[in-house]
């Protein structure tokens, strides 16, 4: 199995996470190409983009709710993977960590490392302007210097966030409703902070589902899933 240093990158963003070395379940060249699956992002003069603008303004209204804004800003974190995964702690019913839940942690980290590269090609190809850039707005999260000039379509946070929900719901199916609800809100946080258009987010959920489907055909993924399920049952 090929080992990777843990990097999620579409320049200029590079994030290193812990000493854990992910092992991908499927090689990148075997993954479906999102350029041939997802539609192109809406043109700025299209009815679909008008809907994106409506949702952008919805997001700005949501910022007026200090509690929801705090959630959206916290959801923007990607520098510490354990912090990220524990955005699902309440929905999942327990904390997730490399030390305390190593099998669950490994399942998630390896799944993300496998599927996340799918977004790189369409991001570079479309290089879609982000909402905060188009409207010369200021983002409420810390990401603005890193995101400026980097394509918005599809959304990496949303792809990973929806994938995390899909995987955790396999581990703990009795908590699926809460897990999916958390993932849905996590993805929408990207609209609220002005990092992404709604169409970025919606198509990223589809992209995550495509990647999740690929994982189901991996013997290594299925074997690790069983370990994670047993660990979950022993700790709940």
Residue ranges of predicted features:
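Hydrophobic alpha-helical bundle signature of multipass membrane enzymes
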Residues: 20-193, 217, 224, 233
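Short alpha-helical patches at coil-to-helix transitions and adjacent helical residues
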Residues: 157-162, 201-208
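C-terminal subdomain of the subtilisin-like protease fold in secreted/lumenal serine endopeptidases
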Residues: 203-205, 210-211, 216-236
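N-terminal signal peptide c-region/cleavage motif recognized by signal peptidases
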Residues: 12-16
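Positively charged n-region of N-terminal signal peptides that target proteins for export
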Residues: 1-3
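Short acidic/histidine-rich active-site segments
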Residues: 196-199
């Amino acid at each position: 199995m090929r080992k990777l240093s843990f990097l999620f990158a579409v320049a200029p963003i590079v994030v290193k996470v812990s000493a854990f070395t992910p092992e991908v379940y499927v090689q990148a060249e075997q993954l479906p190409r999102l350029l041939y699956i997802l539609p192109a992002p809406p043109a700025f003069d299209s009815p679909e983009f008008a809907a994106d603008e409506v949702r952008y303004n919805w997001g700005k209204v949501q910022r007026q709710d200090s509690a929801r804004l705090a959630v959206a800003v916290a959801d923007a974190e990607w520098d510490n993977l354990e912090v990220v995964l524990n955005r699902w702690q309440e929905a999942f019913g327990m904390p997730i960590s490399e030390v305390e839940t190593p099998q669950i942690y490994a399942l998630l980290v390896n799944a993300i490392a496998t599927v996340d590269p799918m977004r790189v090609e369409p991001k570079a190809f479309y290089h879609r302007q982000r909402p905060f850039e188009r409207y010369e707005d200021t983002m409420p999260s810390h990401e603005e210097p890193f995101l400026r000039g980097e394509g918005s379509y599809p959304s990496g946070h949303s792809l990973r966030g929806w994938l995390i929900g899909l995987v955790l719901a396999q581990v703990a199916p009795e908590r699926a409703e809460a897990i999916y609800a958390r993932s849905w809100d996590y993805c929408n946080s990207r609209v609220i902070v002005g990092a992404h258009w709604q169409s970025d987010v919606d198509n990223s959920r589809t992209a995550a589902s495509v990647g999740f489907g690929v994982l189901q055909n991996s013997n290594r993924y299925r074997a690790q899933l069983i370990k994670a399920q047993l660990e979950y049952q022993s700790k709940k």
